[in-house]
A protein has these predicted regions:
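Tandem CBS (Bateman) regulatory domains
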Residues: 2-22, 58-122, 141-149
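Acidic (E/D-rich), amphipathic helical modules within compact regulatory domains
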Residues: 23-25, 32, 36-77
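PDZ/PDZ-like domain segments forming the peptide/carboxylate-binding groove
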Residues: 25-29, 125-127
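Well-ordered alpha-helical segments embedded in enzymatic catalytic cores
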Residues: 29-32, 36, 106, 110
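A glycine-centered beta-loop-beta connector
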Residues: 37, 45-62, 111, 118-144
């Protein structure tokens, strides 16, 4: 009976993953971001320029930036900003915007289709209708989807 209920009315991502989203600005320092990573235990952060979304910074992108920076003999003297890190993300587009009205099963399919096309999404970014100019109201990662019962 429970299975019938779940299949008949699957949960929507907006119900399950709605939360206050912590975003940064492209001019924020890497140091500031690392403090947030340590404090909040997040691995992806939306980055804006003013109110305009610019990309998703991940711990993988930070590691790629660090590896590139350390390839030379000198560590950069200027404190890196998130704009520097965005250029080192493995996929420039490592995210997809989705509507809060899609089901968790549709969200899972988005992750699967991304992998099938060779473009793995680090996160699905939830807005009212899946439009980039709308306010972010949640983030879903592949691990989040696996934890939903």
């Amino acid at each position: 009976e429970h299975i019938d209920e779940v299949l008949a009315r699957p949960k929507l991502v907006g119900q399950v993953f709605r939360k206050r989203v912590m975003s940064f600005q492209v001019t924020d320092s890497l140091q500031h971001t690392l403090k947030a990573i340590r404090k909040r235990k997040y691995t992806q952060f939306p980055v804006d320029e003013g109110d305009v979304f610019q990309g998703l910074v991940t711990t993988v992108g930070i590691t790629n930036w660090l590896a590139t920076s350390m390839a030379g003999t000198h560590f950069p003297r200027r404190t890196p900003i998130l704009q520097d890190i965005l250029h080192h993300e493995k996929n420039e587009v490592n995210y997809k915007f989705i509507s809060r009205y899609i089901t968790i099963y549709e969200a899972e399919e988005n992750f699967k289709h991304g992998v099938e096309r060779g473009r793995r999404f680090e996160a699905l970014l939830i807005t009212e209708h899946g439009k980039p100019h709308q306010k972010l109201i949640g983030i879903v990662t592949p691990i989040d989807i696996m934890k939903v019962d």
